[in-house]
Amino acid sequence: VERGHLVATVETPNAQEGLGINTREDLAVSAAVVRQRILQRFMADGVTIVDPAATYIDADVKIGQDTTIHPFTVIENNIRIGKNCVIGPFARLRPGTKIANEAQVGNFTEVSRTHLGKKTLLKHFAFLGDARVGAKVNIGAGVVTANYDGKNKNVTHIADGAFVGSDSILIAPVKVGKKAITGAGCVIKQGTVIPAQGIIVGVPGRILRKLRPRASPWP
């Protein structure tokens, strides 16, 4: 004004559009506005978000209809979630993860660069990194895929219908065959290949025998 320049006003649809970001507090306030809009979009598309105030989903995530997201869940970028899934509470999905229809990722779980097949259950206290998990697999509480050997990230393959017992540690690379079973607390060494319908137990894991053809051990 003092230099003779004109001053113009800009009208915005709402006050939030004109928020300035000059401090860390301003940044947090603006991020909360954006997060709310992202969640509103998902809910309008048929996703149930139980508590939007305690749910964090990045903008480029894709989630199918009738999936339920429970509180204290963090879903980061580049993630695909199918229809009729259940995620959380207290779950963290990291980039590169794909979850097929009707799968479940429960409380205190972390999934990174992992694919979960249809109707697979990962319900309690587990970490899956760089895993390729088939359909109708049950992952027990406390299971870990130890994907990093200090130099490389390695992949764990778990085939359809497998049953991974609680507290199993799979030191990648590992292959678990179709409808195979790992015993609770088993430590499966790097490079192990468990045959279809095989049973592995112990520390280190040893293959006991193969099962007769059977249905999946869980409904």
Residue ranges and their predicted role:
Residues T23, I69, V137:
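Residue-level signal for inorganic ion chemistry
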Residues V50-E110:
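Acidic, glycine-rich loop-and-beta core segments that form the ion-binding/anion-interacting portion
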Residues N22, R92-T97, N154-I158:
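Short low-complexity stretches enriched in small and charged residues
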Residues V1-A53, A59, D66, T192-G198, ...:
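Terminal amphipathic alpha-helical/low-complexity segments used for targeting or macromolecular assembly
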Residues D45, I57-A59, N77, P95, ...:
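Short, conserved secondary-structure segments in the cores of folded domains
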Residues Q104-P219:
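Glycine-rich hexapeptide-repeat left-handed beta-helix
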Residues G4-L6, G82-N84, K178, G185:
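Secondary-structure boundary/capping motif
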